[in-house]
Amino acid sequence: MAEDKHNKNPLKMLESLGKELISGLLDDFVEKNVLKLEEEEKKKIYDAKLQDKARVLVDSIRQKNQEAGQVFVQTFLNIDKNSTSIKAPEETVAGPDESVGSAATLKLCPHEEFLKLCKERAGEIYPIKERKDRTRLALIICNTEFDHMPPRNGAALDILGMKQLLEGLGYTVEVEEKLTARDMESVLWKFAAREEHKSSDSTFLVFMSHGILDGICGTMHSEEEPDVLPYDTIFRTFNNRNCLSLKDKPKVIIVQACRGANRGELWVSDSPPALADSFSQSSENLEEDAVYKTHVEKDFIAFCSSTPHNVSWRDIKKGSLFITRLITCFQKYAWCCHLEEVFRKVQQSFEKPNVKAQMPTVERLSMTRYFYLFPGN
């Protein structure tokens, strides 16, 4: 009997701790005004019996999921809210705050601003479909574990951050992981064939893996037996010949991968280099290479985490530097800046080389208009 009593005590202790934890969590929700409750509603929760707190709170919930989740993490893990923030290295150029705390939320574009920009820049911007009618899709491909290369520790944070960002921008996000180059190509063709693109106004393709100059590494890659998805394959799959559903619509490609082994930094003098001879070409020497009535490759923009031949850096506890700053800049500026301006904000945050240097680069830009995302519209 004494043994049975001894065995039951830990269960009772756990039950008691669980009730106290949940009660404290609910009180934190109310105290920090996460749910924006009226005073009368707050009083009901404070005064409710322990077993009734959850029911009373559910009856009063508002649309504050993200803040509520952060309060939950802070209460559950008993950590300071600043301990989970992702911060730029101290020596980087003053740029966007990279905290993922309560301030790191997607700023929405006021409807009046949306209407104003659409009117003032009509003909200069890509048209945005009505939210109720559009079916935006986004694809994230991320390889973390490899057969012959080290794991990409911290990549899970990149997936989570990009998925939340794209969903906030109105995209239904498909995530694919652990893919060989052949698997990646198969996923791309299937995604390009999705019917939803017909009623969409754009798409995002996000690739996160090890990489080389010409492509993205699959899970079986090695120097002896390369397993690489060429960048050309991505553009070919979604061009106007193979993906008519996205014709004349922005196709945004985000790449977090090394593009070589160089460190991307160099000691230089203040003396300007000699100017190279300018390149000129007479129009009489130009010939057409295609007879299509529409451009084969148009409305693309690729944003890579580094310049060619250079590495990209990833914090194993916080995620990739590029993805972290990309998300921050979207959250801060997508409401008022077009896509190329947002990308420039990201580049500016890397402008001053730190201990680990890299410079994100825009490539194969064939967008003929400005692409505003107008979050919230």
Curated annotation (Swiss-Prot):
Catalytic activity, EC: 3.4.22.57
Annotated ranges, domain CARD: 1-91
Region (Required for LPS-binding): 1-59
Localization of this protein: Cytoplasm, Cytosol; Cytoplasm; Endoplasmic reticulum membrane; Mitochondrion
PROSITE patterns recorded: CARD, CASPASE_CYS, CASPASE_HIS, CASPASE_P10, CASPASE_P20
Signal peptide residues on this chain, from the entry's feature table: none
Active site (record annotation): H210, C258
Keyword terms, alphabetized: Cytoplasm, Endoplasmic reticulum, Hydrolase, Immunity, Inflammasome, Inflammatory response, Innate immunity, Membrane, Mitochondrion, Necrosis, Phosphoprotein, Protease, Secreted, Thiol protease, Zymogen
An example molecular function term from Gene Ontology annotations: cysteine-type endopeptidase activity
Residues with PTM Phosphoserine: S83
One of the GO biological process terms: protein autoprocessing
Pfam families in alphabetical order: CARD (PF00619), Peptidase_C14 (PF00656)
Propeptide span(s): 1-80, 271-289
InterPro entries assigned to the protein according to its UniProt record, in alphabetical order: CARD, Caspase-like_dom_sf, Caspase_cys_AS, Caspase_his_AS, DEATH-like_dom_sf, Pept_C14, Pept_C14_caspase, Pept_C14_p10
Reactions this protein catalyses: Strict requirement for Asp at the P1 position. It has a preferred cleavage sequence of Tyr-Val-Ala-Asp-|- but also cleaves at Asp-Glu-Val-Asp-|-
Residues carrying the site annotation Cleavage: D289, A290
Enzyme class: hydrolase
Membrane topology value: Peripheral membrane protein
PTM annotation, UniProt: In response to activation signals, undergoes autoproteolytic cleavage and activation.
Annotated S-S bridges: none
Activation and inhibition: Activated by homooligomerization induced by direct binding to cytosolic LPS, in a TLR4-independent manner. In addition to LPS, CASP4/CASP11 may also be activated by oxidized phospholipid 1-palmitoyl-2-arachidonoyl- sn-glycero-3-phosphorylcholine, an oxidized phospholipid (oxPAPC), in dendritic cells, promoting adaptive immunity. The role of oxPAPC is however unclear and another report suggests that oxPAPC competes with LPS-binding and inhibits the non-canonical inflammasome in macrophages.
PANTHER family: CASPASE RECRUITMENT DOMAIN-CONTAINING PROTEIN 18, CASPASE-1
Subunit field text: Heterotetramer that consists of two anti-parallel arranged heterodimers, each one formed by a 20 kDa (Caspase-4 subunit p20) and a 10 kDa (Caspase-4 subunit p10) subunit. Upon direct LPS-binding, forms large homooligomers, resulting in its activation. These oligomers are often referred to as 'non-canonical inflammasomes'. In its precursor form, interacts with TMEM214; this interaction is required for association with the endoplasmic reticulum membrane. Interacts with CASP1. Interacts with NOD2. Interacts with Serpinb1a, Serpinb1b and Serpinb1c; these interactions regulate CASP4 activity.
Free-text note on domains in this protein's UniProt record: The CARD domain mediates LPS recognition and homooligomerization.
Described function: Inflammatory caspase that acts as the effector of the non-canonical inflammasome by mediating lipopolysaccharide (LPS)-induced pyroptosis. Also indirectly activates the NLRP3 and NLRP6 inflammasomes. Acts as a thiol protease that cleaves a tetrapeptide after an Asp residue at position P1: catalyzes cleavage of CGAS, GSDMD and IL18. Effector of the non-canonical inflammasome independently of NLRP3 inflammasome and CASP1: the non-canonical inflammasome promotes pyroptosis through GSDMD cleavage without involving secretion of cytokine IL1B.
UniProt protein name: Caspase-4
Gene source species: Bos taurus
Species classification: Eukaryota, Metazoa, Chordata, Craniata, Vertebrata
